[in-house]
Amino acid sequence: MLSVALVVKMVAKEETKDEVASFLSGAVEMANAESGTPVWFALRTDEHTFWIVDAFPGAGERQAHLDGPIAAALMANADRLLAEPPSISPADVLASKVTT
C-alpha cells in the first residue's frame, strides 16, 4: 500500500529545457532500479515546467529515494539546468489507482 509521496516541481532554463526533458526521460531507468519506488512519473506541463510525482510504501522508502541517484544527479546539475531551485514537497497519499 502506498502511504507517502513526493511532488517535485522543476522550471528549466530556456536553453536547457530539452536537456531537462531528456534527463527525466532517462531517469526512469534509475527509478526502475529502486525497489522501494513502485510509482514514479516524470511530467511536463508546459515548455519549461517539469514535475516528478512518485509514491512509496513508507517514509523510509521515500527517504531512500531522496538519498538515491536521481536526486543526486538532479541536485548536482540544478544550478546549470534550472531557472530556480527545485520545489520538493513531501505528501501523504490519500488514495491511489495505478494499473498498466
Residue map of PLM features:
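Glycine-rich beta-strand-turn "strand-cap" elements at beta-sheet edges
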Residues: 1-5, 9, 39-48, 73-100
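Short hydrophobic/aromatic beta-strand micro-patches
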Residues: 9-11, 53-55
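Short coil/turn motifs at secondary-structure junctions
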Residues: 13-15, 45, 57-59
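Intrinsically disordered, low-complexity acidic/polar segments
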Residues: 17-19, 61, 97
